[in-house]
Amino acid sequence: MASDPNEVDVLEKCFEGVLGLMETRFTSHQFFLRLAHGHQREYVAGLAAFADGGNPFRDLHHALVKRLKKLEGEAITLRKESYPSQDIFGTPSHSGLWKKL
């Protein structure tokens, strides 16, 4: 997909509020869970926008990480690119480790 669908723009507008609820340090997976919990309709719409690719969770989450990286140095900083974490399904995985500024 050349550019992210509009649904990612809608979710990005929720970032400031979600970041306010996060601990000082958090993983991308923790951020996704908080975003999904607080903005369920928008999150489901985001998943649906990526459904044709066959991996909607992975593809949406990659798009969301790209948007989070736009905030680096302003609101957050990426401490580790690959940090041990459980994904949103509870499966051992890796994700970014962030710190609020």
Predicted regions and their residues:
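Phospho-regulated, low-complexity intrinsically disordered regions of nuclear gene-regulatory
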Residues: 1-21, 29, 34-37, 41-101
